[in-house]
Protein backbone atom coordinates (compact mmCIF):
# COMPACT_ATOMS: atom_id res chain seq x y z
CA UNK A 1 0.00 0.00 0.00
CA UNK A 2 1.00 3.64 -0.02
CA UNK A 3 0.32 6.67 2.15
CA UNK A 4 -0.96 10.14 1.38
CA UNK A 5 1.95 12.30 0.39
CA UNK A 6 4.01 9.34 -0.80
CA UNK A 7 4.97 9.61 -4.45
CA UNK A 8 4.02 6.69 -6.66
CA UNK A 9 4.25 6.53 -10.43
CA UNK A 10 1.27 5.59 -12.60
CA UNK A 11 2.63 2.16 -13.62
CA UNK A 12 3.27 1.20 -10.00
CA UNK A 13 -0.23 2.28 -9.02
CA UNK A 14 -1.83 0.31 -11.87
CA UNK A 15 0.25 -2.74 -10.89
CA UNK A 16 -0.84 -2.38 -7.26
CA UNK A 17 -4.53 -2.25 -8.21
CA UNK A 18 -4.31 -5.12 -10.72
CA UNK A 19 -2.63 -7.34 -8.12
CA UNK A 20 -4.99 -6.44 -5.27
CA UNK A 21 -6.81 -9.13 -3.31
CA UNK A 22 -9.59 -11.09 -4.97
CA UNK A 23 -12.69 -8.99 -4.29
CA UNK A 24 -14.92 -11.34 -6.27
CA UNK A 25 -14.38 -14.20 -3.83
CA UNK A 26 -15.13 -11.78 -0.99
CA UNK A 27 -18.41 -10.73 -2.60
CA UNK A 28 -19.95 -14.01 -3.71
CA UNK A 29 -23.40 -13.70 -2.22
CA UNK A 30 -24.75 -17.19 -2.79
CA UNK A 31 -23.49 -20.42 -1.26
CA UNK A 32 -21.69 -22.41 -3.96
CA UNK A 33 -23.70 -25.49 -4.83
CA UNK A 34 -26.85 -24.22 -3.11
CA UNK A 35 -30.03 -25.19 -4.85
CA UNK A 36 -33.10 -22.99 -4.78
CA UNK A 37 -35.92 -25.27 -5.77
CA UNK A 38 -38.23 -24.06 -8.48
CA UNK A 39 -40.81 -26.19 -10.24
CA UNK A 40 -38.05 -27.78 -12.37
CA UNK A 41 -40.40 -28.02 -15.32
CA UNK A 42 -37.88 -25.90 -17.23
CA UNK A 43 -34.52 -27.08 -15.84
CA UNK A 44 -31.51 -25.87 -13.89
CA UNK A 45 -29.60 -22.63 -14.47
CA UNK A 46 -26.16 -22.12 -13.00
CA UNK A 47 -25.36 -18.71 -11.56
CA UNK A 48 -21.64 -17.98 -11.80
CA UNK A 49 -21.62 -15.86 -8.66
CA UNK A 50 -19.44 -12.76 -8.86
CA UNK A 51 -21.62 -10.97 -6.30
CA UNK A 52 -25.15 -11.97 -7.35
CA UNK A 53 -28.24 -10.32 -5.95
CA UNK A 54 -30.96 -12.51 -4.45
CA UNK A 55 -33.49 -10.84 -6.77
CA UNK A 56 -31.82 -12.56 -9.74
CA UNK A 57 -32.37 -15.95 -8.11
CA UNK A 58 -35.97 -15.01 -7.30
CA UNK A 59 -36.76 -14.08 -10.91
CA UNK A 60 -35.26 -17.31 -12.27
CA UNK A 61 -37.22 -19.33 -9.70
CA UNK A 62 -40.45 -17.53 -10.69
CA UNK A 63 -39.73 -18.63 -14.27
CA UNK A 64 -39.64 -22.23 -12.98
CA UNK A 65 -35.87 -22.65 -13.14
CA UNK A 66 -33.90 -24.28 -10.39
CA UNK A 67 -30.78 -22.25 -9.66
CA UNK A 68 -27.38 -23.59 -8.71
CA UNK A 69 -24.77 -21.19 -7.33
CA UNK A 70 -21.35 -21.69 -8.91
CA UNK A 71 -18.11 -20.42 -7.40
CA UNK A 72 -16.06 -18.13 -9.68
CA UNK A 73 -13.15 -20.52 -9.08
CA UNK A 74 -15.03 -23.55 -10.50
CA UNK A 75 -13.54 -25.17 -13.61
CA UNK A 76 -15.34 -25.18 -16.95
CA UNK A 77 -15.25 -28.98 -16.94
CA UNK A 78 -17.06 -29.18 -13.59
CA UNK A 79 -19.61 -26.58 -14.69
CA UNK A 80 -20.37 -28.50 -17.88
CA UNK A 81 -20.82 -31.72 -15.89
CA UNK A 82 -23.70 -30.12 -13.92
CA UNK A 83 -26.15 -30.68 -16.82
CA UNK A 84 -27.42 -27.10 -16.78
CA UNK A 85 -29.80 -25.50 -19.28
CA UNK A 86 -27.65 -22.39 -19.22
CA UNK A 87 -25.40 -20.14 -17.18
CA UNK A 88 -25.96 -16.63 -15.89
CA UNK A 89 -22.77 -14.71 -15.10
CA UNK A 90 -23.82 -12.38 -12.31
CA UNK A 91 -23.18 -8.79 -11.48
CA UNK A 92 -20.41 -7.89 -9.06
CA UNK A 93 -17.69 -5.38 -8.18
CA UNK A 94 -14.42 -4.42 -9.78
CA UNK A 95 -12.60 -4.19 -13.07
CA UNK A 96 -13.63 -7.11 -15.30
CA UNK A 97 -10.25 -7.04 -17.06
CA UNK A 98 -8.57 -8.23 -13.86
CA UNK A 99 -10.63 -11.45 -13.68
CA UNK A 100 -8.49 -13.52 -16.04
CA UNK A 101 -9.40 -16.84 -14.40
CA UNK A 102 -13.13 -16.23 -14.83
CA UNK A 103 -12.61 -14.99 -18.41
CA UNK A 104 -10.65 -18.17 -19.27
CA UNK A 105 -13.39 -20.35 -17.77
CA UNK A 106 -16.08 -18.54 -19.76
CA UNK A 107 -14.04 -18.94 -22.97
CA UNK A 108 -14.14 -22.71 -22.43
CA UNK A 109 -17.90 -22.61 -21.85
CA UNK A 110 -18.75 -20.60 -24.98
CA UNK A 111 -20.28 -22.83 -27.64
CA UNK A 112 -21.00 -25.61 -25.14
CA UNK A 113 -23.88 -24.07 -23.18
CA UNK A 114 -26.08 -20.95 -23.46
CA UNK A 115 -24.63 -18.07 -21.42
CA UNK A 116 -25.86 -14.62 -20.53
CA UNK A 117 -24.46 -11.97 -18.25
CA UNK A 118 -25.67 -9.08 -16.14
CA UNK A 119 -23.43 -6.02 -15.68
CA UNK A 120 -20.00 -7.43 -14.69
CA UNK A 121 -21.12 -10.77 -16.16
CA UNK A 122 -21.89 -9.10 -19.50
CA UNK A 123 -18.45 -7.51 -19.48
CA UNK A 124 -16.76 -10.85 -18.65
CA UNK A 125 -18.66 -12.54 -21.48
CA UNK A 126 -17.64 -9.74 -23.85
CA UNK A 127 -13.97 -10.07 -22.89
CA UNK A 128 -14.17 -13.85 -23.35
CA UNK A 129 -15.44 -13.22 -26.90
CA UNK A 130 -12.49 -10.96 -27.69
CA UNK A 131 -14.21 -7.61 -27.23
CA UNK A 132 -12.74 -4.67 -25.35
CA UNK A 133 -14.03 -3.26 -22.06
CA UNK A 134 -13.14 0.28 -21.07
CA UNK A 135 -13.41 2.30 -17.88
CA UNK A 136 -16.05 5.00 -18.15
CA UNK A 137 -14.79 8.54 -17.64
CA UNK A 138 -17.77 9.11 -15.37
CA UNK A 139 -19.45 5.96 -14.06
CA UNK A 140 -23.20 5.54 -13.79
CA UNK A 141 -24.06 5.56 -10.10
CA UNK A 142 -27.39 6.23 -8.42
CA UNK A 143 -31.10 5.64 -8.72
CA UNK A 144 -32.00 8.29 -11.25
CA UNK A 145 -30.97 6.98 -14.66
CA UNK A 146 -33.72 7.06 -17.31
CA UNK A 147 -33.74 4.09 -19.70
CA UNK A 148 -35.93 3.88 -22.79
CA UNK A 149 -37.19 0.42 -23.67
CA UNK A 150 -38.09 -0.12 -27.32
CA UNK A 151 -41.82 -0.58 -27.71
CA UNK A 152 -42.69 1.35 -24.54
CA UNK A 153 -43.40 5.04 -25.03
CA UNK A 154 -41.97 6.13 -21.70
CA UNK A 155 -38.66 6.05 -19.92
CA UNK A 156 -38.16 3.93 -16.82
CA UNK A 157 -36.03 5.29 -14.00
CA UNK A 158 -33.37 2.76 -13.02
CA UNK A 159 -30.71 2.33 -10.36
CA UNK A 160 -27.25 1.77 -11.78
CA UNK A 161 -23.79 1.25 -10.34
CA UNK A 162 -21.10 0.59 -12.89
CA UNK A 163 -17.85 2.13 -14.01
CA UNK A 164 -17.00 -0.02 -17.06
CA UNK A 165 -18.60 -0.63 -20.45
CA UNK A 166 -18.04 -2.75 -23.53
CA UNK A 167 -16.34 -0.63 -26.19
CA UNK A 168 -18.75 -0.44 -29.13
CA UNK A 169 -15.89 -0.10 -31.62
CA UNK A 170 -14.57 -3.55 -30.63
CA UNK A 171 -17.58 -5.46 -31.98
CA UNK A 172 -18.38 -3.83 -35.31
CA UNK A 173 -17.26 -6.87 -37.34
CA UNK A 174 -17.72 -9.75 -34.91
CA UNK A 175 -20.18 -12.61 -35.33
CA UNK A 176 -21.07 -14.28 -32.04
CA UNK A 177 -22.62 -17.74 -31.61
CA UNK A 178 -26.25 -17.63 -30.49
CA UNK A 179 -28.59 -20.20 -29.01
CA UNK A 180 -31.78 -20.23 -27.01
CA UNK A 181 -32.97 -22.00 -23.89
Predicted segment positions?
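Cysteine-nucleophile active-site neighborhood
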Residues: 86, 91-157, 163-165
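Conserved small/polar residues in nucleotide/adenosyl-binding loops
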Residues: 172-178
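Active-site environment of divalent metal-dependent phosphoester hydrolases
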Residues: 54, 165-167
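Short, glycine/acidic-enriched loop or turn micro-motifs at the edges of active sites
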Residues: 52, 93, 178
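RNA-binding accessory domains that recognize and position tRNA/RNA substrates
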Residues: 1-73, 77, 81-82, 96
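Short loop/helix-cap segments at secondary-structure boundaries that form the rim of catalytic
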Residues: 79, 126, 168-171
Amino acid sequence: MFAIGQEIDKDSLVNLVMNARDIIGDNSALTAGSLNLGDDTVGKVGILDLGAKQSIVNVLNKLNFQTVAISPKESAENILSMNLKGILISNGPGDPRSLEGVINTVQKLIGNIPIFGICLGHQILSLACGLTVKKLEFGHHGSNHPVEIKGIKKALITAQNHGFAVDAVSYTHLTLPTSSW
